[in-house]
Amino acid sequence: MDGLATGLAILIAGFMAAVAFETNQPGLGWLAIAIIGAGVGFLPYNFRGRKPAVIFLGDGGATFLGFTLACLAVKGNWADHSPIVSFSNPLLIFGVLIYDMIHITVERVATGKVRSIKEWLDYVGKDHLHHRLERALGSRQASVAMICLMTICLGLAALALRDAGTTEAVLLLGQACLIVAMITILEWSGRQKR
């Protein structure tokens, strides 16, 4: 979907850079900024509003961005004072992607579309969040915008964790789970009405 992977990479790298600099990890921050720069240079050719994209990331480009961002998330020490806060930061920043992966896995297993790990890895379908939102909202641009807005909401929660304790981290994760639950309920009820 035009602009989705690039836009998410820019947002996720932006939140990771902000948290990295806040937690005194400038090396990770600068790596994240490099990803932002690459994405900003690529985005005008990949997302052109109602016009079709001129270039695409392809599987290689999207996989590289995802792998690099995941490596930054694993490498980082996102909080010194609480392991829960340190664990919560990447969970919130990557929250939309994690939600999509869990949702489609549960749905594919529950409906019998996949029966083994190999089938799960090989399965390609139009049941990802961006496809579901495109059907619900009526356009690809609206779907991309909605996913980016959800990523911003969860990323802002990650920024709020800077000086948070364990209780605040658990509350922010709980809030994120409730937002995801509301989205799931709305999706499910929309499907039932068709």
Where do the protein language model's features map onto the residues?
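Alpha-helical transmembrane segments
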Residues: 3-194
